[in-house]
Amino acid sequence: MKKVLNFHFSYIYTYFITITTNYKYGDTEKIFRKFRSYIYNHDKNSHVFSIKETTKNSNGLHYHILVFTNKKLDYSRVHKHMPSHSDIRIELVPKSISDIKNVYKYMLKTKKDIKMS
């Protein structure tokens, strides 16, 4: 958590992103790799922290991603570079300790309070 907190306050923007796909048309892992490549081309100094999750209900695979960057993401440009069947949700995380802790906690799917050290 300490590293995530450091990145959150060291970079201008922190985005919480979820990537899912319709398996009929695409591979979530390929889309994640393409997205990660897009982010690093967008800002070479950015940092990506991701968690891959498989849901048992629908046998679906999706990614929860934190992107730390000094350049603002243009949502429409991101979507333009991704396949049309991919579902990418992008949210800006406010610059507060409680907000980043809640996002991180959600990503880890834990009910426990997260320590800062």
Curated annotation (Swiss-Prot):
Pfam families: 117-like_vir, REP_ORF2-G2P. Its main location: host cell. One of its GO terms (cellular component) is membrane. It is a single-pass membrane protein. Keywords: Host membrane, Membrane, Transmembrane, Transmembrane helix. It is found in: Host membrane. It comes from the Viruses. The chain crosses the membrane at residues 4-26. InterPro entries: ORF117-like_Rudivir, ORF2/G2P_dom. This is Uncharacterized protein 117.
